[in-house]
Each structure stands twice: as C-alpha cells, then as structure tokens.
C-alpha cells in the first residue's frame, strides 16, 4: 500500500481555499437594491446559487466550471462529454435551491483557437441544454495565449421559483423520507485528486466516458412536493 492521498498532496489546499473564499466574500459590497425591489438579494442558508427578487418570483443564478477534468479529457481526446459536465454542474446547483433552470451561457478560454475543439464543445453543450430543457442563450469565447495555457470551460445558469418556494430545509423533521438519486460516476469534482491517484490511462478513459447528468427530469416532481438538498 502506498501513502494515503489527499487534496493537499495533489496540490490543492482546501483549507487555504476556504480562507480565500471567506476573504473574498468579506470584501464584497452589500447590495444597492433594497428588499422588495427587483434584484434585491434573497438570503438562503446553505444555498448553492445566488438568489434575487423578481416581483412575485425569485431568480436563481449558479456558475461553475468543469475544472481539471478538462485536462484529462484533452489528453485522451474525449472532449465530447465535457459540455454535459459544464451544464449539469450548474443546473444541478439550481435544482438544489428549488429553482427550475431556464437558460445557460458558457465561457470558453483557450490559448489558441481550434475549430475542431470548439465544434465538439458546441455540440455537447447544445445536446446537454436540450436534455436539461434550458435555452443556450449565448456565451463568450476568449483566446488568451498570454494567460491561459490549456482549455478552460465554465458556465452560468439562470433559474426561477415562485417567491417562498425555495428549498431551505427549515421544515425537515424526524420521519421524513430521504431520497437518494444514483450518480452516473465521478462528475466534475475532485479530478485533481483523481489524477494524482489514478495513473492507469485505460481506467481514466473509462471514467471520462461517464457524463455528468442533469438531475432535472428526476427531480422536478420531488421539488414540487417539497424537498431539501444534501450533498456528499
């Protein structure tokens, strides 16, 4: 048996990252929108998305990226699934706060433009948005040879729910039924550690063939009847 692996040994200090995020949040200015106004922030404890007021509704925003899974996908020539990962990471976060995903925009950064790569990304993003029933409303493509050394892909999703309809977990009580949805495999979290642990490229190919799945179709009935999100 080799030495146990953790995030720190793979190059990611999650404790330092948590401190950095706390410093960022502490430096952000409060909203210029007062409660009751369009765009006023809505506090949702433990929420996976940013929420604002919008009349009788609330809008929810989530942003996330594919991360270091892109590095592996590029090396083994399997970029066809990363669009699914990008869309799923965002729409699944919206579902966690009780929002119905409506629209998605992507951000692609590359050191050098490659029509074949962009075509593969565009096709998978489009397919994923169709499956998740969200509109692919646009995006940004940046060629940044002086800043970006490898492909980076991220996105932002917009959703909505009626005011008062968000998932807060406030009504949880003993005896409630906990429903677990099966995972299709390793999605897009923890691939820096995966890369450090797994060195057999055949196994990596098999892992990459599993695409992240938007939870929308299986989750909406549950959400309509009330729910709470637990991630682990």
Summary of predicted features, one role per range:
Residues 2-232:
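Helix-biased detector of long, well-ordered alpha-helical tracts
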């Amino acid at each position: 048996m080799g030495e146990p692996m953790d995030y720190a040994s793979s190059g990611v200090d999650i404790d330092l990252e948590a401190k950095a995020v706390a410093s960022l949040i502490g430096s952000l200015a409060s909203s210029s929108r007062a409660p009751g106004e369009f765009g006023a922030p809505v506090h949702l404890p433990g929420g996976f998305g940013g929420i604002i007021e919008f009349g009788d509704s609330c809008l929810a925003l989530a942003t996330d990226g594919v991360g270091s899974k892109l590095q592996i996908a590029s090396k083994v020539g399997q970029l066809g699934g990363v669009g699914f990962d990008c869309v799923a990471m965002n729409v699944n976060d919206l579902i966690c706060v009780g929002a119905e995903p409506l629209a998605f925009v992507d951000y692609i950064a590359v050191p050098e433009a490659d029509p074949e790569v962009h075509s593969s990304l565009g096709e998978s993003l489009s397919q994923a948005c169709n499956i998740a029933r969200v509109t692919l409303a646009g995006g940004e493509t940046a060629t940044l040879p002086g800043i970006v050394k490898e492909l980076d892909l991220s996105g932002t999703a917009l959703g909505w729910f009626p005011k008062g309809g968000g998932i807060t977990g406030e009504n949880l009580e003993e005896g409630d039924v906990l429903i677990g949805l099966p995972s299709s495999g390793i999605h897009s979290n923890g691939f820096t550690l995966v890369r450090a642990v797994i060195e057999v490229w055949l196994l990596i190919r098999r892992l990459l063939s599993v695409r992240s799945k938007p939870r929308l179709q299986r989750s909406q009935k549950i959400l309509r009847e009330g729910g709470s999100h637990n991630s682990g």
